[in-house]
């Protein structure tokens, strides 16, 4: 049995930080949250005016943030003394836990800045753990070559390859690329909430087409299976997480 689509979300154009322009898909008016995910943004522009002001110091508490850079550079600093530089293909994994103040500021580069940020809720018993931070360089993220494309494994396991991300709850996070008219099957635990976000091309699931900039939410049982269209290569983010089923204060 394959998972079916239960909703497709367009997201909204907005800004955050000191005016960084982005598309908010989870955490916006059409999808407040998808347990355990509190927020999912795509940020990106080839115009420095859209992102150069960055995200000055601001507080977080009680969840994890996962920032995945496709292109560009952002420098991280936080109140625990951590500092790191996000660059092409790398990931910043921060556990806010009991509380941390951090900043994410872009460094000037030629061309496009593009990436994603995901907020992962922590269960009540873990909300007051010590803050922690790790940079995952691009060359430490395994890339699984398949006949019809490739899968970057940021967290979770695909084809017996496990990603370097170490969440405190069950989470799968892949960056998938499929050639034209190809398909992929991904085993996922039952009762986990799952979505794919298309950032280039078009995904197909049965009679549904998921366009660039759209997020599709799937049912909670079965195999995740989707295809690319005949007209373009598909690039998408695949995320699935163990539900927490606890109230969230927003």
Where do the protein language model's features map onto the residues?
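Jelly-roll (double-stranded beta-helix
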Residues: 1-250
């Amino acid at each position: 049995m394959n998972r079916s689509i239960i909703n497709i979300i367009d997201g909204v154009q907005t800004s955050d930080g000191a005016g960084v322009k982005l598309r908010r898909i989870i955490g916006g008016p059409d999808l407040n949250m998808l347990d355990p995910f509190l927020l999912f943004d795509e940020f990106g522009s080839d115009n420095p005016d859209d992102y150069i002001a960055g995200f000055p110091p601001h507080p977080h508490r009680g969840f994890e943030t996962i920032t995945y850079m496709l292109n560009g550079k952002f420098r991280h600093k936080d109140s625990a003394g951590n500092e790191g530089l996000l660059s092409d293909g790398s990931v910043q994994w921060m556990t806010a836990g009991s509380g941390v103040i951090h900043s994410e500021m872009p460094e000037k580069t030629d061309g496009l800045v593009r990436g994603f940020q995901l907020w992962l809720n922590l269960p009540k018993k873990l909300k007051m753990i010590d803050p922690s931070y790790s940079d995952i360089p691009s060359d430490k993220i395994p890339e699984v070559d398949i006949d019809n494309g490739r899968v970057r494994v940021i967290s979770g396991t695909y084809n017996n390859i496990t990603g370097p991300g170490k969440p405190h709850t069950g989470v799968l996070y892949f960056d998938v690329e499929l050639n034209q008219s190809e398909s992929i099957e991904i085993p996922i635990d039952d009762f986990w909430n799952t979505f794919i976000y298309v950032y280039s091309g078009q995904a197909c699931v049965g009679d549904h087409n998921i366009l660039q900039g759209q997020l599709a939410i799937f049912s909670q049982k079965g195999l995740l299976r989707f295809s690319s269209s005949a007209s373009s290569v598909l690039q998408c983010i695949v995320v699935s997480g163990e539900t927490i089923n606890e109230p969230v204060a927003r």
